[in-house]
Design a protein with these regions (language model features):
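Secondary-structure transition/turn motif
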Residues: 56-61, 82-83, 154-156, 209-214, ...
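Alpha-helical oligomerization segments
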Residues: 164-235
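N-terminal leader/presequence regions that precede the main folded/catalytic core
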Residues: 1-95
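Short, solvent-exposed secondary-structure boundary motifs
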Residues: 32-36, 117-133, 185-198, 207-211
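Short, ordered beta-strand-loop transition motifs
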Residues: 43-51, 143-145, 200-204, 221-224
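Generic surface-pattern signal
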Residues: 18, 24-27, 31, 41, ...
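Surface-exposed beta-loop interaction hotspot
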Residues: 84-182
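Short amphipathic beta-strand/extended segments with alternating polar/hydrophobic composition
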Residues: 62-70, 152, 215-221
């Protein structure tokens, strides 16, 4: 399906909040990452050529750009656009500059280097970058001694980005909220929006329309001022 970005999601969200942006992006990101894992990665060996901007899984090769790197020694994240001494060609760092342009209000995307923690890590930053991208893309973590590079992958099969039906949406949504810290209302809204699924919303209810089936999600605010889902039912 044609890419729909998180940036024009109709629900209100704080453009300066990493948690809000992550919540919007996580649903679709997890879905497509899981599909890529099943269809492309599997048990294949992988290889990255950052100078050519290519990543290989087995015998399959795709275009890849460097988002940034995690350092286990310094416990920091460094965007590729800020790593001026890397020697990487412009085409390999273009995606990180695109993410910087797309998210001008998000401090973490405007700061070249910062400390890692539970929220600020390569996976979360990559999911937001993928969600804001105008293209259908996934990401991959490429470990090396002392850290890991996170790359954004282009040219993947379209089936990875196919629309999720009601069962797949619910299965993925429930799986995410079971073990991933996020705002459940923004997670649902961002997932449905990027999935191309019509939905209505207010502060405490989202109703999604999957053809003739309507699913209602009810939320409440928690003490840490994020939304938690209280009920999922069929209308």
């Amino acid at each position: 399906m044609e890419k729909i970005t998180i940036l024009d999601c109709p629900v209100w969200y704080d453009k300066t909040s990493l948690l809000d942006m992550l919540s919007l992006a996580a649903g679709r990101a997890f879905l497509c990452q899981n599909r890529m894992g099943e269809l492309i990665v599997g048990d294949s060996d992988w290889g990255l050529d950052p100078m050519k901007g290519l990543i290989r899984f087995g015998k399959q090769e795709f275009t890849a750009g460097i988002l940034g790197t995690e350092s286990e020694i310094q416990n920091t994240w460094l965007w590729s656009w800020a790593h001026t001494e890397s020697g990487l060609p412009e085409k390999s760092t273009a995606i990180s500059r695109r993410a910087k342009r797309d998210l001008p209000d998000l401090p973490e995307f405007q700061t070249g280097k910062f400390m890692l923690d539970e929220l600020h890590n390569g996976h979360n930053l990559a999911m937001i970058s993928v969600g804001a991208s105008p293209d259908n893309v996934c990401y991959y973590r490429c470990p090396y001694d002392g850290g890991a590079a996170f790359v954004e992958i282009h040219g993947l099969p379209e089936e990875i980005f196919a629309q999720a039906d009601d069962k797949e949406f619910l299965r993925q949504y429930i799986q995410i909220i079971s073990g991933f810290y996020c705002d459940h209302r923004l997670l649902a809204a961002g997932f449905l929006h990027q999935n191309g699924t019509a939905f209505t919303f207010d502060e405490s209810v989202i109703t999604a329309e999957f053809g003739t089936r309507k699913i209602r999600l009810t939320f409440e605010r928690t003490e840490d001022d994020i939304s938690r889902v209280m009920d999922i039912s069929e209308v």
